[in-house]
């Protein structure tokens, strides 16, 4: 496999596994569901690790690394869904990137010399990109929230200005409606 193909493969793996992390942004998880998800991840890890027992040398190491990575990602995703915050989702994406890096690094052990060095550097680059993307996603969400708030404040000021044209009870009613609508 050429370096370019390996790099594309690694990037595809990282993107494929980190993007679903953000898919559950709106859904929460109860405490019992969270506990069950962690238990399920641990059980799946044990089952996957058992399947690695028949392998030898680096193939076994890669298999175990993949099983550990799957467990780490499943637990991180469960925690992110349970906490249901941008920070938790970012942490899950970072955990996924690091787990994928560990697997990729283990796969590089089959190579020798410069090929191995290049493989490790490419794996590290993919990890770094995935972590940067996870952090950027949180920053974008924060900027969008700030923009939403700024727009709401501007709309509130317009509504209050419109209320100034009224007088008495109508003005009070208009102002109260604007305050309720824009949560000011």
Segments and roles (model prediction):
Residues 11-21:
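Bacterial N-terminal signal peptides
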